[in-house]
């Protein structure tokens, strides 16, 4: 069995800048888009964002800002092309 390795969040988020990510909020919604920027509080700016509720797309939102205290997790999305935003 392999153990989960701890990751320092700031370098991890900075490494995802310019790539497609999925961000799940504490309230159950998910947002997929290109991570444009992360600040020192770990607020997220996404471009080409799409909202998902219960796995169903609710539509395209464009550019959004997600406040840090709402985020449950952030991860890279495999199979998506990198985009300069």
Swiss-Prot record:
List, alphabetically, the CDD domains matched.
Answer: Sm_F
Q: Which UniProt keywords apply?
A: Cytoplasm, mRNA processing, mRNA splicing, Nucleus, Ribonucleoprotein, RNA-binding, Spliceosome
UniProt-listed SUPFAM superfamilies: Sm-like ribonucleoproteins
| InterPro entries per the UniProt record, alphabetical | Lsm6/sSmF (IPR016487), LSM_dom_sf (IPR010920), Sm (IPR047575), Sm_dom_euk/arc (IPR001163), Sm_F (IPR034100)
Q: What is the top-level taxon of the source organism?
A: Eukaryota
What Pfam family is a match, any one?
LSM
Disulfide bond positions: none
Q: Which SMART domains match?
A: Sm
Q: Could you say which residues form the signal peptide?
A: none
Q: What function is annotated for this protein? A: Plays a role in pre-mRNA splicing as a core component of the spliceosomal U1, U2, U4 and U5 small nuclear ribonucleoproteins (snRNPs), the building blocks of the spliceosome.
Q: What is the recorded name of this protein? A: Probable small nuclear ribonucleoprotein F
Source organism per entry reads: Caenorhabditis elegans
